[in-house]
């Protein structure tokens, strides 16, 4: 009689390469894998690992957030903000300070505003030449839980102290807004 072996721990479930077939992304991974191996700097390891991640884990960041975090860190104009994701424009921001940004993508409007105010935009291969160990850089990322789908996660909708959004087919007064919420439909709490 055979032994029932538990294969639960056999494989490590984590990405070792990007799932995307984008050749430029795989070249960046190759570059940062080399840099991490040669420099042993945590910055290169984090950049490499974030390049593997799925698109949902590359959340976008607004110009306002980038500028705020740079100001918060008290960084000078030589420092580079590093975002492994997209940098987007923020129309609520009147004046954009001088920023040096390195990102996978920068939207057209954000690019215009950064360059207009004397800032610079680097690609990750340019950053590797400029700062191979991550000196004078500020690594930042957008909020991963900002996606609409996260509003549906958590305690079941309807139970006490739950702020979770229900998945509803209809939004009329006779549906989620009815029983327990109006006296004409059973009761009202």
Curated annotation (Swiss-Prot):
Any GO CC annotation of this UniProt entry: cytosolic large ribosomal subunit
Any idea where this protein resides? Cytoplasm
Q: Which InterPro entries match?
A: Ribosomal_eL18, Ribosomal_eL18/eL18-A/B/_CS, Ribosomal_uL15/eL18, Ribosomal_uL15/eL18_sf
Which segments of the protein form a coiled coil according to its record?
none
| Gene name of the record | RpL18
The family classification in the record reads:
Belongs to the eukaryotic ribosomal protein eL18 family.
Record keywords: Cytoplasm, Ribonucleoprotein, Ribosomal protein
Organism equals Anopheles gambiae
Which GO molecular function annotations are given, in alphabetical order? Answer: RNA binding; structural constituent of ribosome
Q: Which GO terms describe its biological process?
A: translation
Q: What is its main location?
A: cytoplasm
Q: Does the keyword Phosphoprotein apply?
A: no
PROSITE patterns, A to Z = RIBOSOMAL_L18E
Short name of any one Pfam family annotated for the protein: Ribosomal_L18
By what name is this protein known?
Answer: Large ribosomal subunit protein eL18
* Disulfide links within the chain: none
């Amino acid at each position: 009689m055979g032994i029932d072996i538990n294969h639960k721990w056999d494989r490590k479930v984590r990405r070792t390469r990007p799932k995307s077939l984008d050749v430029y992304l795989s070249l960046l991974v190759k570059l940062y894998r080399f840099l991490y191996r040669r420099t042993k700097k945590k910055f290169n390891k984090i950049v490499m690992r974030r390049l593997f991640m799925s698109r949902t884990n590359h959340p976008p960041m607004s110009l306002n957030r980038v500028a705020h975090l740079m100001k918060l860190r008290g960084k000078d104009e030589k420092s580079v903000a590093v975002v492994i994701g997209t940098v987007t424009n923020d129309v609520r921001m009147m004046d954009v300070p001088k920023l040096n940004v390195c990102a996978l993508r920068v939207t057209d409007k954000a690019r215009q505003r950064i360059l207009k105010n004397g800032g610079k935009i680097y690609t990750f291969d340019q950053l590797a030449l400029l700062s191979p160990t991550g000196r004078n850089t500020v690594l930042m990322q957008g909020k991963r839980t900002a996606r609409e789908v996260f509003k549906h996660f958590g305690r079941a909708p309807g139970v006490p102290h739950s702020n979770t959004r229900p998945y509803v087919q209809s939004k009329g007064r006779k549906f989620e807004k009815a029983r327990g919420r109006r006296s004409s439909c059973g009761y009202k709490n």
